[in-house]
Amino acid sequence: MIDRKQFFKKVFNALLAMTGIQSLSAFKGFSESLPIQSYTMPVLFVGHGSPMNGIEDNAFSQHWSSIAKDIPQPTAVLVISAHWYTKGTLITAMEHPKTIHDFGGFPPALYQVQYPAPGFPSLAKETASMIHSTNVQLDHEWGLDHGTWTIIRHMYPDASIPVLQLSIDYSKAPSFHYALAKELMQLRNKGVLIIGSGNMVHNLGMVAWDKLNEPSYGYDWALEMNNAFKELILKKEHDSLIHYERLGKAGQLAIPTPEHYLPLLYSLGLQDKIDPVAFFNDTVVGGSLTMTSVKIG
């Protein structure tokens, strides 16, 4: 007669040995890895603009809310934000990421906002293990910066969907970021919504503050580059977008520093050959910032 208890114990121990997992709690985390879904999740690049968009009911935030209704409910959200710019690549791996108010000079109401979405430590570990081009560190200090929560709180206001952030390694070339994104492709098949959050055209030093309320007011170079970026995206000419330094004087004005542009390369790196592209919030603000956003898939 086979002792059922001993039999299942042997099977369990064999599974631990096969997977290299050392404990029951670790096995639980392993078993909770997201399954493959019957659909492929779209990818977004979102122009996040001013932190005030996080609390305002305007055309931008309304589009964020509506696009969430047009895509499947995600199992988790992974954001590559312009505002987590680090030496090395990190991913948030805490149970409860804090809401970070990483800005100054705004109304008190903005600093009072909390977005208490859960983290997803086991998914953070799984994501880190997918990336072979660099060592990804599990981070327990950061949280959700305004490049993330100002958008997500309009998309998923009940804060019930787990949210993670992946940092941007400032020591790496644009081609590195584009290639790293491709290593995350499997997440799309697991229902994870990946969002690059920045701005294609982002020159704060040239903002026309007196024109902020003038719809679509833009400098000639900003309008030129907004159109050029869209055309290159539609033609899938990703190499030209990776090597943006070749885009002339207008390109230099549009991207004086790379941190708000690089999230776009993550979104484009995740584009499959058959993925359609659609633009939304396609407008210029204050002359030198574009809110132009992209839905891929």
Regions found by a protein language model. Give the residues of each.
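Long, well-ordered alpha-helical scaffolding segments within enzyme catalytic domains
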Residues: 63-70, 175-190
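Internal, conserved structured core segments that host functional sites
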Residues: 123-178, 183
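Beta-strand elements within well-structured catalytic alpha/beta cores of enzymes
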Residues: 42-47, 76-81, 166, 187-200, ...
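A short aromatic-anchored loop/beta-hairpin motif
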Residues: 33-135
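Surface-exposed, charge/polar-rich loops and edge strands
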Residues: 161-162, 172, 186-193, 200-297
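N-terminal secretory signal peptides and thylakoid transit peptides that target proteins
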Residues: 1-22, 29-30
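Flexible, glycine/proline-enriched loop segments at strand-loop-helix junctions
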Residues: 110-118, 140, 167-174, 251
